[in-house]
Amino acid sequence: MTFMIRDVPKDARPRERLLSSGPESLADHELLAILLRTGTKEESVLQLAHRLLKHFEGLRLLKDATIEEITSIKGIGTTKAVQILAAIELGRRISRLSYNGRYVIRSPEDGAKYVMEDMRFLSQEHFVAIYLNTKNQVIHRKTIFIGSLNASIVHPREVFKEAIKRSAASIICVHNHPSGDPTPSREDIDVTKRLAECGRIIGIELLDHLIIGDQKFVSLKEKGYV
């Protein structure tokens, strides 16, 4: 017999709990169980969802898993994997829709909020430049490179070339630490100082360099490096 949601006690069923208390009240594995709908002959859908998350160490790695990696889990077939991937992609698109307008960045918190959900789960370091107009509105965003950050790779020319092309008044640079710890490294500080100096020469101010961790961030401006 395959375990289904209806086999779970009513007061513990994720769907009923969502209806009564809202989706924010559910744990990650409960939301996942609603997508999966059925378990296996050996375990309930809640147990299956919990095992799936444990395999991927939570949402961080599941977010970037391939259909082959997901279907390698016992009890997860193509249909279930497709449902999971579709839900993840919808989440990504909704996150992007939130900022399709001219988002205004007036503080490090504003900048971190703008990129946090896109960058906190990335498995590699991404260095991103955010270009602003004179009203501190975002006019463009560009990934400059992907990989370990060092001063020889992050060339100011690539950062400021786009700023000139977009007639940007200022820029904010952002990169993530896949470890989840946003503590700046010596390389982070060196890159920041180099970009800030180039910005002063060109006349396009580097407002900040943000390091994104897992729901945490560090502003190198607040640390006194910009």
Swiss-Prot record:
Residues 104-226 form the MPN domain. Keywords: Hydrolase, Metal-binding, Metalloprotease, Protease, Zinc. PROSITE patterns: MPN, UPF0758. SUPFAM superfamilies: JAB1/MPN domain, RuvA domain 2-like. The keyword Zinc applies. GO terms for biological process: proteolysis. One of its GO terms (molecular function) is metal ion binding. It holds the Pfam family UPF0758_N. A motif (JAMM motif) lies at residues 175-188. CDD domains: MPN_DUF2466. Zn(2+) binds at residues 175, 177, 188. PANTHER family: DNA REPAIR PROTEIN RADC (PTHR30471), UPF0758 PROTEIN YEES-RELATED (PTHR30471:SF3). Belongs to the UPF0758 family. This is UPF0758 protein GWCH70_2550. It comes from Geobacillus sp. (strain WCH70).
